[in-house]
Amino acid sequence: MDRLIALLKNNARISLEDAAKQLDLTPETVAATIDDLEKRGVLRAYQAIVNEDKLEADQVTAVIEVKVTPEREGGFDHIATRICRYPEVSSMYLMSGQYDLMLFVEGPDLRTVATFVSARLSSIPGVTGTATHFRLKTYKHHGVLMESEHDNERLQVSP
């Protein structure tokens, strides 16, 4: 099962036949295992990894560190559940260290993300502080390099 998950992480579009060959299983066994993983919630989604820097559309991504006061009943879970329901929040993690939650937030521009942080996120009871960091460039995402070797080639300049 771990080998199948590794294959799917590397290429979610791999055919049942190719996965079966690599794992020395039958396509039917691979299909049944994938079905079981989906039903148990192990496989949550199949997504494309997109190089946002190559798209024409403007999209702003920010990492937001959030300090919160944990609740007596439920700790961080209640406030985390509330925050992750916002559509702007694409990913969210409970962290160790100087802040409690790490959010990845997306919006059409800096102002929209800043307004989300100042008007919506900071006003939630229990949120005691935030620090926002805007993504400038992505070099690697989910194990995938965003530039090939020749993307960075520069023209030689001679005097």
Language-model region placement:
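A compositional/biophysical signature of low hydrophobicity enriched in polar/charged and small residues
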Residues: M1-P159
